[in-house]
């Protein structure tokens, strides 16, 4: 009688199979729909091909395109299909590496000449032939020296180097599809025919192993999906991302710009700085209502402060240093050490806690020039930064309040988010009981508010557990924005204490928190999320008044003055241009309201209202328009153009 294996599925059910059955065969017995969708699997948590055999009792998870790891396998096979096509068209090409990415993939090639757009079209056509052929993809484990001989005989020098880098205790494996063989740990799809929809996107330069001293390679990017519709949707989002790019919209809308004289530092223009101040002042009011004390601490600080905090030893490479009068200083990369100094400046009682210190001052960190990316990755920035000094028994309550503040800000802006709870790492510092209670307090706060969250075991900082809030924008991209970080170590390093009810000194817990995070980055995200169609309340220019002819300038000036006096950000366009031209320009600048004034409007004390993204609202008494605008500003509502942009839908 043949042996059997017991396989536990994710739902807890246990199935019995003959020993040695392939995963593909086992999945077929579970159901035809799952068998058709299956891409790869995890056996006892290890990624494997569907051709792998079940030799002992185990857990089994079938991966489909709905799973992140399933998509990675799908796109990893896509890189091999692309590499096979390149080798067919360019036999002299040398293969290096080709990993999957979140929504795409790439492969680096050593080629004698640059690839052209026409070359990409030919590669795509050849890939289609490989998919049509539906070659089985076969895994083979080989001897290390045999693998080196195999690739050396074919002139694949980079692959020989890669074999040498495989640890001695790891298996060397190759994958073959048709005439093509590549060194790869896998897993892969069962056959090339599974990749039905793909597109090559671009070619860029890349260096072998990322070292500029090495030869430059050609990196071909592509993407792939299970269906043509999913591919089309992704390509639409990709084009939308280009159209919404804040690095283009910022200068076009007169918000900000970057100059070579200050790489990584934004030059804020008048309109952009208005938007910046609106967000900052809104945040300030929300924090004042919750008992925060706003401070301003020095921008340049002695290295001695950072020696105490530990940043000089562990973060110095990311700081801008200054040497003056035989002393070392640095521009401030974060506010927490200075806030510790303020806390320690006087004796604190348990009644003084929680003490909430907020600051919006300038910060700077050194980032390599190659990593800078508009407002999203800068060297100079500001944060809606705050530090809460609390008793251990106050942690849960204060975390709830911070999450409530996140809700208020993100909810108003129409941003959805996911929460990650990162717990104690192996190299944690401090008392394990305090860690356990802090992690439990974070979890209780989330559970008590009915929040779902993802647990990241061991991913916390060494000095405390944390919550990360990942925002999803209109194009489905995720951005880590808000952070709530517990810190047990800085209070120790700065010897921070408070006098408890028992009259003895106790150590406070420090909570680092930022809601928007870096304001520069947050504005970059919002610019792309709204495609420049900012809600009325934060729009740099809320209305533009357009006189039809010169004789209407006086009335237009009266309208501008009255609206500005009422607190609206309004400007007039008095240029000697046709009104249609001025309307079109105001629309391109995404101004929420366009107010046209002529004889009828001047006589009636009215304005002809055009709303962004909508048809004309028609003539309206000026007082009625003002009431409409003020109501929308007070409620922080979004107009149709703003809502549509934030939804990411096609026109």
Curated annotation (Swiss-Prot):
Coiled coil: none annotated. Residues 245-535 are annotated as: Catalytic. SUPFAM superfamilies: Class II aaRS ABD-related, Class II aaRS and biotin synthetases, TGS-like, ThrRS/AlaRS common domain. Its EC number is 6.1.1.3. SMART domains: tRNA_SAD. InterPro entries: aa-tRNA-synt_IIb, aa-tRNA-synth_II, aa-tRNA-synth_II/BPL/LPL, Anticodon-bd, Anticodon-bd_dom_sf, Beta-grasp_dom_sf, TGS, TGS-like. Residues 1-64 form the TGS domain. Zn(2+) binds at residues 336, 387, 512. Binds 1 zinc ion per subunit. Its cofactor is Zn(2+). It catalyses: tRNA(Thr) + L-threonine + ATP = L-threonyl-tRNA(Thr) + AMP + diphosphate + H(+). GO terms for cellular component: cytoplasm. It is an enzyme of class 6 (ligase). GO terms for biological process: threonyl-tRNA aminoacylation. It is found in: Cytoplasm. One of its GO terms (molecular function) is transferase activity. Pfam families: HGTP_anticodon, TGS, tRNA-synt_2b, tRNA_SAD. It comes from the Bacteria. Catalyzes the attachment of threonine to tRNA(Thr) in a two-step reaction: L-threonine is first activated by ATP to form Thr-AMP and then transferred to the acceptor end of tRNA(Thr). Also edits incorrectly charged L-seryl-tRNA(Thr). Belongs to the class-II aminoacyl-tRNA synthetase family. Homodimer. This is Threonine--tRNA ligase. It comes from Symbiobacterium thermophilum (strain DSM 24528 / JCM 14929 / IAM 14863 / T). The gene is thrS.
């Amino acid at each position: 009688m043949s042996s059997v294996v017991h396989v536990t599925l994710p739902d807890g059910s246990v199935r019995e199979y003959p020993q040695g059955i392939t995963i593909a065969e086992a999945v077929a017995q579970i159901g035809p729909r799952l068998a058709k969708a299956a891409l790869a699997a995890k056996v006892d948590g290890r990624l494997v091909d569907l051709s792998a055999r079940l030799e002992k009792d185990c857990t089994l998870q079938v991966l489909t395109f709905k799973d992140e790891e399933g998509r990675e396998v799908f796109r990893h096979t896509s890189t091999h299909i692309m590499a096979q096509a390149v080798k067919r068209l360019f036999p002299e090409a040398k293969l290096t590496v080709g990993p999957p990415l979140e929504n795409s993939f790439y492969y680096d090639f050593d080629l004698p000449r640059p690839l052209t757009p026409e070359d990409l079209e030919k590669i795509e056509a050849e890939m289609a032939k490989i998919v049509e052929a539906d070659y089985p993809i076969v895994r083979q484990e080989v001897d290390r020296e045999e693998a080196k001989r195999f690739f050396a005989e074919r002139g694949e020098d980079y692959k020989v180097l890669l074999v040498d880098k495989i640890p001695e205790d790891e298996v060397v494996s190759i994958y073959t599809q048709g005439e093509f063989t590549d060194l790869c740990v896998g897993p892969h799809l069962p056959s090339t025919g599974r990749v039905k929809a793909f597109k090559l996107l671009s070619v860029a330069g890349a260096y072998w192993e990322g070292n500029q001293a090495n030869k430059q390679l050609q990196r071909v990017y592509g993407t792939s999906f299970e269906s043509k519709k999913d591919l089309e949707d992704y390509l639409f989002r990709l084009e939308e991302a280009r159209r919404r790019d804040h690095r283009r919209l910022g200068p076009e809308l007169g918000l900000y710009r970057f100059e070579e004289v200050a790489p990584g530092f934004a030059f804020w223009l008048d309109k952009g700085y208005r938007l910046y101040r609106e967000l900052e002042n809104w945040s300030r009011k929300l924090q004042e209502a919750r008992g925060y004390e706003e401070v301003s601490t020095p921008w340049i600080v002695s290295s001695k402060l950072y020696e105490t905090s530990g940043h000089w030893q562990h973060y110095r490479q990311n700081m801008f240093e200054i040497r003056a009068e035989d002393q070392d200083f640095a521009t401030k990369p974060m506010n927490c050490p200075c806030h510790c100094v303020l806390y320690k400046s006087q004796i604190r009682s348990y009644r003084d806690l929680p003490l909430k210190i907020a600051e919006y001052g300038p910060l700077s960190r050194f980032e390599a020039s190659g990593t800078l990316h508009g407002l999203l990755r800068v060297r100079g920035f500001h944060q809606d930064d705050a530090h809460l000094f609390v008793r251990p028994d106050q942690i849960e309550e204060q975390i709830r309040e911070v999450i409530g503040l996140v809700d208020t800000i993100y909810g108003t802006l129409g941003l959805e988010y996911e929460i990650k709870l990162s717990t104690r790492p192996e190299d944690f510092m401090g008392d394990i009981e305090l860690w356990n209670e802090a992690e439990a307090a974070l979890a209780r706060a989330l559970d008590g508010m009915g929040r779902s969250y993802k647990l990241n075991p061991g991913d916390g900082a060494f000095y405390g557990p944390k919550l990360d809030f990942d925002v999803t924008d209109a194009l489905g991209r995720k951005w880590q924005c808000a952070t709530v970080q517990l810190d047990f170590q800085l209070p120790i390093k700065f010897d921070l204490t408070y006098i408890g009810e028992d009259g003895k000194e106790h150590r406070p817990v420090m909570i680092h928190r930022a809601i928007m995070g870096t304001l520069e980055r947050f504005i970059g995200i919002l610019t792309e999320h709204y495609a420049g169609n900012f809600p009325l309340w934060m729009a740099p220019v809320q209305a533009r008044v357009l006189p039809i002819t010169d004789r209407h300038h006086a009335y237009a000036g009266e309208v501008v003055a009255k609206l500005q006096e009422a607190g609206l950000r309004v400007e007039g366009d008095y240029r000697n241009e046709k009104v249609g031209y001025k309307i079109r320009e105001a629309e391109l600048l995404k101004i929420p309201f366009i107010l046209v004034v002529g004889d009828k409007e001047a006589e009636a004390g009215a304005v002809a209202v055009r709303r962004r993204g909508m048809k004309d609202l028609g003539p309206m008494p000026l007082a009625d328009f003002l009431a409409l605008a003020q109501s929308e500003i007070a409620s922080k509502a979004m107009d149709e153009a703003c809502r549509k942009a934030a939804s990411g839908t096609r026109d």
